[in-house]
């Protein structure tokens, strides 16, 4: 029973975290979530980049490298915006995360999490107690 409860909790938490990552206003988080990258994978990529890249050997170089990457990203976004106006509107005019929509979405999210937990618990019980 405890194992079933633990598995249901872990699977439900994973679904919530992945959903939160996909609905997050951060483009970087969405890209990582859609690529299926975990935080372990991102940390490993950063470690490999720091080990093999000559620009990342020292901490001061890392700051310069991040500034260069940020500037490149900013320029790319400026140049790409006129070619894709529909994406430009989405990227620039995002809904602020602190805006309140009332209690409706919170109740719906709670009901969805509870239903997911119950469904996963049922499936685990069904396949393990045969």
Curated annotation (Swiss-Prot):
Domain of life where this protein originates: Eukaryota
Motif RxLR-dEER boundaries: 32-62
Primary subcellular site in the record, as a coarse category: secreted
Signal sequence annotation: 1-21
One GO location term (cellular component): membrane
Compartments in which it is found: Secreted; Host cytoplasm; Host nucleus; Membrane
Membrane topology: Single-pass membrane protein
Keywords (A to Z) from UniProt: Host cytoplasm, Host nucleus, Membrane, Secreted, Signal, Transmembrane, Transmembrane helix, Virulence
Transmembrane segments: 104-124
Induction pattern: Expression is up-regulated at later stages of infection.
Function description: Effector that acts as a broad suppressor of cell death to interrupt plant immunity. Inhibits cell death induced by cell death-inducing proteins, including the PAMP elicitor INF1 from P.infestans.
Entry's free-text remark on domains: The RxLR-dEER motif acts to carry the protein into the host cell cytoplasm through binding to cell surface phosphatidylinositol-3-phosphate.
Similarity annotation: Belongs to the RxLR effector family.
Protein name, as recorded: Secreted RxLR effector protein 66
Gene source species: Plasmopara viticola (Downy mildew of grapevine)
Primary gene name: RxLR66
């Amino acid at each position: 029973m405890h194992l079933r409860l633990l598995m249901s909790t872990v699977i439900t938490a994973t679904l919530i975290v992945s959903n939160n990552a996909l609905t997050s206003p951060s483009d970087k988080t969405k890209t990582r979530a859609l690529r299926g990258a975990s935080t372990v994978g991102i940390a490993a990529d950063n470690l490999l980049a720091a080990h093999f890249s000559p620009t990342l050997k020292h901490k001061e170089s890392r700051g310069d490298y991040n500034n260069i990457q940020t500037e490149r990203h900013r320029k790319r976004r400026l140049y790409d915006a006129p070619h894709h106006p529909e994406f430009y509107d989405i990227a620039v005019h995002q809904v602020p995360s602190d805006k309140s929509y009332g209690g409706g979405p919170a109740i719906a999210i709670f009901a969805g999490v509870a239903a997911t937990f119950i469904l996963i618990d049922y499936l685990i019980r069904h396949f393990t107690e045969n």
